[in-house]
A protein has these predicted regions:
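Active-site helix-to-loop segments that bind/position phosphate- or nucleotide-bearing substrates
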Residues: 1-156, 161-183
Length: 183
C-alpha cells in the first residue's frame, strides 16, 4: 500500500492552512495529517486485513511526484498559455522538478494564471469585497472537473491551454454517457 512517505507534507500543510482560513474551527483541523486524510477520503484502513495507506485520491491530491508517477506511469499535468500568434507557449506549468506535481499544487499554480485575464466584478457579500463573477466560477469548475474526472490510468495527461480568446481543457478518459445524452 501507499504510505505516508509518499505524501508531500507541504501540500497537506497548505491544504490545512487553506481550510482553516476558509472555515476556521472546522472539526477536521483538530486531526493529525493521517486523521485529516482519513476524514477527506485520502487515507483508508482495510477493516478485513488491517492494512492501511493512502488512497488513489489521496496520492493524486497530496502525493510526491515520484510516487504518483510510479503508480500512474503516464501521469502528466500541463498548463500552457498560447500567444495570439499561435506559436509556442509563452507561459507553462508542468512537472519540471521545482514543485510537487500533485493535483493540489497544480490547481493552485494554474488557477491564478487562468483567472488573471478575466474582468473583475465588484460585489459586497457580508461586508467583504468579492471580485469573482460567473465566468470565474465556470472556469474554476472546468479546471477542477478536468482534474477530478481524468482517467489517470489512461494514456495522455491533463492539458490546459489558455489562448487569447478561449480555453481548452482536456484529460484522458471518455464520457460515461453517449454524446446524444450529453447534448
Amino acid at each position: 500500500m501507499i504510505s505516508l512517505e509518499d505524501l508531500d507534507e507541504v501540500s497537506v500543510a497548505q491544504y490545512r492552512q487553506l481550510l482553516g482560513s476558509v472555515r476556521p474551527g472546522h472539526p477536521f483541523l483538530k486531526w493529525d495529517d493521517k486523521g485529516l486524510l482519513l476524514k477527506l477520503g485520502g487515507w483508508k484502513k482495510d477493516r478485513y486485513t488491517g492494512k492501511e495507506g493512502l488512497t488513489v485520491a489521496g496520492l493524486l491530491m497530496f502525493g510526491k511526484t515520484e510516487s504518483i508517477v510510479e503508480a500512474f506511469p503516464d501521469y502528466h499535468v500541463d498548463y500552457q498559455e498560447i500567444p495570439e500568434s499561435g506559436e509556442r507557449w509563452i507561459d507553462r506549468v508542468y512537472p519540471d522538478g521545482t514543485w510537487e506535481a500533485n493535483l493540489f499544487q497544480f490547481f493552485h499554480l494554474v488557477w491564478p494564471k487562468v483567472s488573471r485575464s478575466l474582468p473583475k466584478t465588484f460585489k459586497l457579500k457580508n461586508g467583504q469585497r468579492h471580485d469573482e463573477g460567473a465566468v470565474h466560477e465556470a472556469l474554476r469548475e472546468a479546471l477542477a472537473n478536468t482534474l477530478i474526472h481524468a482517467d489517470y490510468f489512461g494514456i495522455g495527461g491533463v492539458v490546459i491551454k489558455k489562448y487569447t480568446d478561449c480555453f481548452l481543457f482536456s484529460n484522458p478518459g471518455c464520457l460515461l454517457i453517449s454524446q446524444a445524452q450529453y447534448y
